[in-house]
């Protein structure tokens, strides 16, 4: 088996495991299902910033890099059967990976900003958090995982 194929398999396993871990973190540790108010969301981000930071790395940044490896491994494996389709799928996978990496990095940079700002002006921190969240949601495909859906097709 080729090295790229092995790394692609490892990347796919990482992606599956990181999703399972992420679900547990979001539901059990962060309890996001009970948060209905933006002020609660901000408070949770301030109180559990280490967990949030680590989760952003796990679920967005590292996941994005794994997605690049998986996309390239799938391209290499399937390019002879449908070369044009695999070129499109690989391009979408790499674009999706880039948006996930950017989203995770922006979220972590924004987290540092709101934590610092919250100590001085909680109201301004809340407004800043809403702006940062809009940006990271846009980058991270929070509108239904359009890129992920296209890539999976």
Positions of predicted regions on the chain:
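Hydrophobic, aromatic-enriched alpha-helical segments typical of multi-pass transmembrane helices
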Residues: 1-153
């Amino acid at each position: 088996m080729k090295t790229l194929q092995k790394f692609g398999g490892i990347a796919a396993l990482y992606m599956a495991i990181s999703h399972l871990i992420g679900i547990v973190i979001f539901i059990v540790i962060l309890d996001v299902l009970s948060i209905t108010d933006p002020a609660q969301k901000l408070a949770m981000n301030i109180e559990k910033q280490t967990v949030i930071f680590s989760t952003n790395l796990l679920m967005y940044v590292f996941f994005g890099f794994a997605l690049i490896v998986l996309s390239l491994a799938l391209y290499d494996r399937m390019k002879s059967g449908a070369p044009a389709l695999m070129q499109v799928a690989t391009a979408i996978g790499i674009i999706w990976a880039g948006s996930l990496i950017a989203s995770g990095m922006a979220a972590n940079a924004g987290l540092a900003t709101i934590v610092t700002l919250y100590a001085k002006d909680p109201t301004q921190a809340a407004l800043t958090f809403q702006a940062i969240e809009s940006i990271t949601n846009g980058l991270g495909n929070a509108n239904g995982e359009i890129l992920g859906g296209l890539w999976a097709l």
